[in-house]
Amino acid sequence: MSDLAHQRRQRLIGIALMCGAVALFACLDTTAKYLNTRMDSLEIAWARYTAAFVLTLIVSNPLTHKGLLRTKRLTLQITRSVLLAASSVLNFVALRWLQLDEALSIIFTFPFIVAIAAGPLLGEWIGWRRWAAICCGFGGVLLITRPGFGGMHPAAFLSLAATICYGFYAVITRIVSRVDSNQISLFYANFIGALVMLPVIPFVWTTPDNWLIALMLMGTGILGSAGHFLLIAGHRIAPASVLSPFVYTQLIWVVILGYLVFDNVPNRWTMAGATMVIGSGLYLLYRERKLGKATTSEGVVEGPLE
């Protein structure tokens, strides 16, 4: 097999892994939205991180892989983990009232937050073309939410807050990836996420009604962990610039699942706004690729909020 054919094959496998990852994340959001009718959103988020942490212990076993606990940027690891946990909680709470496609369309603006924050935090300043794309993208968010016009539920602002938290999490992840591996970052994200929510769990705990609900609750951690595993695996064999556009295929899955599970159909405002957001995000990727700033690194894995 020629080098070119091998590279093409690796990229196709990477794309398949990315599409599989976002499909699992769509299933996670669907499960969380369903469980929201049975229990508190904090309990769902805590179960998601606790189950993922247990899986990390089983797969990685820090007793035999002691490097898993050794981070050179402990403060930043804690900060990014708290931001990720906060984004998950806010997203799950928002899903109590929003349709899956509505919440995801807002979350798709996280690359804009990254682009804005990367200037002061990473020294990666953006030009007027990308500023225009960001403004267009946030215009799409206004079209989706329609504030002041009796549009979407105010919970949309929780999705926006979740997106901001996730954007700063992604920027800090870029910083720690220079010295820590993905495995270390994933371990701390799951551990800190479960730990920070633990004190409030006794006050919001609801025992699952039956074994199916209990399995779904544990399944949130499995879906999240499996999705991140596919995400990391895809970035190891294909450039981020090739994989990133396929993040947006998650919208296809949430529209299908939203209809099948909740009988939700996207309205024209959501679809029009989502088109603006996705188009602006793809243009940002195009500009970064053209300017040579889109890099492939095992330590930099950015994907959907989960």
Where are these regions (language model features)?
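Membrane-interface helix-cap regions at the ends of transmembrane helices
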Residues: 3-5, 53-72, 138-151, 193-213, ...
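Loop-to-transmembrane-helix transition segments
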Residues: 13-19, 60, 65-90, 154-162, ...
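Hydrophobic/small/kink-forming positions within alpha-helical transmembrane segments
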Residues: 22-27, 57, 81-89, 111-116, ...
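Transmembrane alpha-helical segments that form core, pore/gating elements
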Residues: 33, 41, 56, 149-209, ...
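C-terminal transmembrane-helix exit sites in multi-pass transporters
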Residues: 91-93, 111-132, 252-271
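Hydrophobic transmembrane alpha-helices of multi-pass small-molecule transport proteins
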Residues: 129-145, 269-288
